[in-house]
Amino acid sequence: MAIALQPSDLVFEFASNGMDDIHQLEDPSVFPAVIVEQVPYPELVHLCSGLDLDEVHNGIIRDRTLCMTQDQILEGSILLTDDDVSTSNNVSSTEVLFNVATPSDVLDEKQIFSSPEVLSDSNSVQAINLPNFLLSTPEPDDLKKTSDAGDQKEHSEEEKVSREENLRKMGKARKRNRKTKNNRSTSPVTDPSMPIRKKSKDGKGSTIYLWEFLLALLQDRNTCPKYIKWTQREKGIFKLVDSKAVSKLWGKQKNKPDMNYETMGRALRYYYQRGILAKVEGQRLVYQFKEMPKDLVVIDDEEESPETPEDSSQASTSSTPSTSTIRRASSRVGTRASPEDKDNPPWEKPKVQHTGLQPSASLELGLSVDEEVPTTSTMLASPLQSQARLTKTVSSSPAPSNIHLGVAPVGPGSTVTLQTIPLTTVLTNGPPASTTAPTQLVLQSVPQVSTFKDTFTLQTSFPLNTNLQENQVATQGAPLILSGLPQLLAGANPQSNPAPSQVIGAGSAGPSSQPPGTVIAAFIRTSSGTSVPVVKEGPLRSSSYVQGVVTGAPVEGLLVPEETLRELLRDQGHLQPLPSQVLSRGSHNLSLVGNQTLSPPSHPTVGLTPVAELELSSGSGPLFVTEPSVTRSPTQAPFSPFNPTSLIKMEPQDI
C-alpha cells in the first residue's frame, strides 16, 4: 500500500505487486477498495492529533460528521510501500485515524465555536476536500495495541470527569430539595426551656397546646381551685372540677365557641400516645402528667378558701359606715358633666377615713362651669352606725361649744374646706344643767355674684340619747360630706311656749324668731366658673361673708346630699310644714325685708321654701333669682314631733 501526500487530497492507493503500469490505477474495476475522503478544514486535522483528549467533549461531531464508506479499507494483506517514510509517523497517523473513526466526541465545544463556521449538515461533509498527506499505515497488530491503550486512557479520564460532575449535581440537588427540620421532642413537658406560646404556621398570632393550657390553668389563682385543681401535685395528677368551663375556656383560646368536653377529650387522648398525659383509671375527669415540668407556680388551697363569716362580719362592721350604706347613699347623687369638661374628672369619691375630730377637713371637688350643681346641704339624720351606740347616755359636758361650718362656692378645680371645732354637746331629754351658753351653728359662705343659697328649716323634737362619736367620716359619693360633726341632729322635747331663737344675718337690721332646736339647711348652687376665695383653716373670715346663726337648744349637724334629702322628704308626707325663712344672697350687701308671708307648699313637706318646693316638684330646674333680702314669717304654725331616725332606712347588715 502506498500513501501519497498531496497539498489538497489524501489518497490511499491499494495496488497489487503485479501492477507495473500507472495508468491501470484509473480503472475502478481493478482497485475497488481505493477510497478518497475529504476533511472540512485543514486546521481541524491538528485538533485530532490526540493532544486534546483530556478536555471535555460534546456531542456536536459524531460518527457521521466525517463519513466513510461502508466498505472497510483496512485488511490484513495491506502492506506499507515506504517503511522509511512511515516509521516516523506511525503513532501520529494511527491516532488521527482512530480519532476520526471513534464513536466518542473528538472536538471541544470552545474550539468548535471559535472557528469561523460551524458544521451545519452531515451530508455536506462529503463535498469538502481534505489536505493530502502521505502517511504510513502500521500493521494490524500494532493498530490493535495502540487503539486499546488509547481507549483505556480516554475511558478512564472520561469516567473521572463524569463522576465529579455527577457528584456536584447531586450535591446541589440535595441542598435545594432538603430543608432542615428541628427534631420534635418526644415529651415537651421535660423541656422547661421551651416557650409555652409559639408562632403559628402562617406567622400570625400564637398557638398553645392543650397540655400547656391546662398547666396555665393550674397555675392561675382564678381557675385553679374553681375549675381545675391538683389532687396529687407530686405525682402530677389533676382533676377537671368543671369540665364544661374548662372546655369553654379552651374554645375561647382556640376561637371555637362550640368547643365541648367531648371534643377536648379527643385531644387529651392524643397525648396518651405521645407520653405526655395519662388517664387515671377508676376516676372520672382525672388525668396525670407523665413527667412533671419544672418551675411551676404552686397555689395553696388555703389561700383560695373564702373568708369565714366571722371575718366578713368584722370587716363589714369595721367600716364606718358600711360599704353598702355608702353605695346606697352615693347612688342617689347624680352629677352631669358638660361636654366641654369631659376631660375633667367628675366628683371625686373620697375614701372612708377613721380619724378623730380635726379642726378642719377639706374635700376636693370638681364642677362644670355652666352647670349648677348642689354643693352641700344639712338635714336631720339618724346615725349610720348601729342602734346600740345611739342609746348610750353620757353625763353633761362642762361647757357647750360652737359649730363653725364654712362653705365656699365651688368652681372648676376649686376646693371646699369645712371648718369644724370639736363639739362635746350632750344630747339628753333637756338642756344640761351645766350648759352656760346655747350651741351655735354658724353657716359661712364665700360671697359670689352669681351664687344663690336656698335655706329651709327642720324642727327636731324627738328626744334621743346619743354618745358623741369621736370620729370623722367622709363617705363616697359627692357632695356627701360628713365632716367632723356628730351623726345626729336632736333637741329637747317640744315645749308649749318655746323660747324664740334668733337668726342673724350679716348686716341685717333685725332678728327673726325660730323655735329652739331648729336647723338651717342650706343649698348652695353656683352658676359661673369665676374664681372665688377658698375657706381655709383658721378662724372665721371677715364680715363680708354671709353668716347665719341659730341659737337655742343644743343641736348637732350632718352634711348629706341634696338628692338624698329630697327623696327622704318625699317619704315623709305626713309631716307638717314648719315656719321657714329664706336667706338669699346675690351680692355682698344684705337688706332685711320684713312682714312677708310665704305661701305653704302644694304638698306636705318639712319646712321647704317655695323655691325648694319648685325644685322638688320639677327636679333640678333653674334657680329662682331674687334680690338680696331676708324674708321671715310673722307667725309660727303648729308642728308635730317626728322621729328623725325614720329618715334613714336601716338594713340588717347595718345594725
Swiss-Prot record:
PROSITE patterns: EF_HAND_1, ETS_DOMAIN_1, ETS_DOMAIN_2, ETS_DOMAIN_3
One function term, GO molecular function aspect: RNA polymerase II cis-regulatory region sequence-specific DNA binding
Any one biological process term the GO annotation gives: natural killer cell proliferation
Compositionally biased tracts (Basic residues): 169-182
UniProt feature, compositional bias: Basic and acidic residues: 141-168, 338-351
SUPFAM superfamilies reported for this sequence: Winged helix' DNA-binding domain (SSF46785)
Covalent S-S links between cysteines: none
Effect of mutating W250S: Higher IL17A, IL1B, IL6, CXCL1 and TREM1 expression in bone marrow-derived macrophages from mutant mice compared to wild-type, after LPS stimulation
Region (RUNX1-binding): 86-205
Comp. bias intervals (Acidic residues): 301-310
Disulfide bond found in the keyword field: no
Subcellular location: Nucleus, PML body
Residues bearing the modification Phosphoserine: S187, S633, S640
Residue ranges, compositional bias (Low complexity): 311-332
Principal place of residence: nucleus
A single GO cellular-component term on record: PML body
Location of the region described as Disordered in the Swiss-Prot/TrEMBL record: 136-202, 301-362, 493-512
Keywords: Activator, DNA-binding, Nucleus, Phosphoprotein, Transcription, Transcription regulation
Quaternary structure and interacting proteins, as annotated: Interacts with RUNX1 (via the Runt domain); the interaction transactivates the IL3 promoter. Interacts (via its C-terminus) with PML; the interaction translocates ELF4 to PML nuclear bodies and enhances transactivation of LYZ.
Protein family: Belongs to the ETS family.
Summary of the function given for this chain in its UniProt record: Transcriptional activator that binds to DNA sequences containing the consensus 5'-WGGA-3'. Transactivates promoters of the hematopoietic growth factor genes CSF2, IL3, IL8, and of LYZ. Acts synergistically with RUNX1 to transactivate the IL3 promoter. Transactivates the PRF1 promoter in natural killer (NK) cells and in CD8+ T cells. Plays a role in the development and function of NK and NK T-cells and in innate immunity. Controls the proliferation and homing of CD8+ T-cells via the Kruppel-like factors KLF4 and KLF2. Controls cell senescence in a p53-dependent manner.
Name of the molecule in the record: ETS-related transcription factor Elf-4
Gene symbol of the encoding locus: Elf4
